[in-house]
Amino acid sequence: MKLTTNDLFASQPLFHCPCSSSSRPRRRRFYGLHFPINLTSEKNNSLSIVALSDSDLPSRTAFSRRAFLLAPPLLVSAASLFLKPSVSLASEESSSATVTSPAESAAPPPPPATTTPSPPPPVNKEETITSRIYDATAIGEPMAMGKDKKKVWEKLLNARVVYLGEAEQVPTKDDKELELEIVRNLRKRCVESERQISVALEAFPLDLQDQLNQYMDKRMDGETLKSYVTHWPAQRWQEYEPLLSYCRDNSVRLIACGTPLKVLRTVQAEGIRGLSKSERKLYTPPAGSGFISGFSSFSRRSTFDMSLPTQIVPFGPSSYLSAQARVVEDHTMSQVILQAVADGGGTGLLLVVTGASHVEYGSRGTGLPARISRKFPKKNQVVVLLDPERQFLRREGETPVADFLWYSAARPCSRNCFDRAEIARVMNAAGRRRDALPPDIQNGLDLGLVSPEVLQNLFDLEQYPLISELTQRFQGFRERLLADPKFLNRLAIEEAISITTTLIAQYEKRKENFFEEIDYVITDTVRGSVVDFFTVWLPAPTLSFLSYADETTGPDSIDALRGLLGSIPDNAFQKSLAGREWNLNLRIASVIVGGLKLAGVGVVSSFAAVGASNALNIARKVIKPELVVAEKPKRSPLLKTAMVYGGFLGTSANLRYQIIAGLIEHRLSDELSSQPLLVNAISFVVRTLNSYFGTQQWIDLARSTGLQTQKSIPASKEISEALEEPTVECDTTTEEESIDKLNNQ
């Protein structure tokens, strides 16, 4: 029976896959050509052509004609299989239904693109912002902004007018510091974006604009400008002077937007009707403007708040005149602001420094933003309240009192001082639980007094087993490490200097008797190390939450003393912490208290050193009686030595270590935080010089008070003096060393 083409291909399918799990390679045969193509599924996916033996076919001549007829189509099929990439064949072997066209299969894979990595863009180092910022538009409690203040600056820069509302009932200098901080940062960003920035001040009446222009052009000094604001309180000029000087030195335009005093006093005394016709046209809103200013917008709060007795204010003649004065103030400032915005072009930024009551509730209130919003888009105005006394919980549907609440770092806070979400992230990253932290840290977190940075520093330090054990057991050690993570470096530098210089001085003095008198050497070295430890420990800055966590009860006098000591910083130059403000009196008290502590250390160490010397002398006489001499050497008086040495540590040493720990190692190290090697080198040099000059001061003091004699001593008595006289000097100098110096002279 003659086979047809259909019978040939139907008898053995092209993609026939046997179901048996044989390890042999599967073959796909094209019987018409007698060249079966073996498609193996091995790693190389190679294609091989296996020749059939003669026994596989009945005869060669029977199908020569069929071979000739089937050759062209089968050659095309074979070529397509050869041109298929190995990846497509492997996918077919794994029963994928994807069919690739020959043209697509023949296309070579594209070469891998070689992209040169572009250099990373320069990262602008953001200025450290120590103040606290809250988003007042959040529902519920105002939300603390994290350490990343980019969103705040972006919103301020996107506005055309930024209102800075100062405290009016109880003015504070912290507001002026915040204003300078905000102006400085905004001015830096406006210079980068080539925008003009101006500052409008309500404190300056608009009739003083010429004087402000002369001050900006440096044709008038500060004292002359001060003579035009004699109506200010005495301290207000000192508070405004840094802001005025910065604006003048950095070409930030100053605008006077306050109501002239004559007009304001006339309205307060007689009302608007007391103004002339021309003054009414300039300083009063047109009839039918719809604003009745001077009263709080109670509709922004709940009915419960409106019913409080403290909110009810009787309306009398004086209140009516005050309301009219408020209308005049708001209208005058709004006109100046609109003109300043127009003068600034389409991209200028205007900062308005005014009272908080003039800007509360923004465009939905009754103050400046509401008046300007009629001629100005609402989204181009941002309201910032500086150091507000209260934080309201915003309910759904209520108008926020402002866009941001901005607190100075020194202002006390009762809740949510730091971003709690950031604190939770730090806790989760470290795998720590709040109940496993020390009690003072837990209460500090509950009150919002522990920043995420401080918490991260604590976790980093606890990675070392020894430091972790010390921080968990000793609160004083933990407080100093939190305030200064390099506290151990300072302590190690001081101890290394003390021990090294003491041993060198002892060896130079005793020379060949150094090891024979090793007991005296050890006594002096240990005493100097203990004293140096406390001179580093006591003046060191601390970050303490003990006053918040300590809930123990005791006598009133003890509580009062504990509260007094808790309010005093450990170092006079320590930076103000969140919720604490240390004035000049408290910093002076810090020096006094620190001096008393070091004086106590000096008295105790003197008693201990003299007692140890006497005990060693007695033991030496018992062990080596041949060292006993007939003449008893002169000894320094015990009580006098202790009092003089305590006074020396409480005055000279206290002041020197306050400066080193506060100014050099606390404030200067923060400025040079990016160069730790330089900071450590400066600390080492300063402490070495301090040890040297401190020793010289103690020698002069000991001689002037009679603790050390200056007369010549015979050489025969030199050994007995060196063996028996107790040491009373600071750190490295002994009494015997000073005597030898005199003998050499």
UniProtKB/Swiss-Prot annotation:
Pro residues bias located where?
107-123
Q: Which organism is it from?
A: Arabidopsis thaliana
What membrane topology is given? Multi-pass membrane protein
Q: Where is the composition biased (Low complexity)?
A: 94-106
Q: Which Gene3D superfamilies does the record match to this protein?
A: 3.40.50.11550
Q: Which SUPFAM superfamilies match?
A: EreA/ChaN-like
* Family membership noted in the UniProt record: Belongs to the RETICULATA family.
Q: What is this protein called?
A: Protein RETICULATA-RELATED 6, chloroplastic
Q: Which InterPro entries match?
A: Cofac_haem-bd_dom, RETICULATA-related
Q: Name one GO cellular component term.
A: chloroplast
Q: Which residues cross the membrane?
A: 529-549, 591-611
Q: What is its main location?
A: plastid
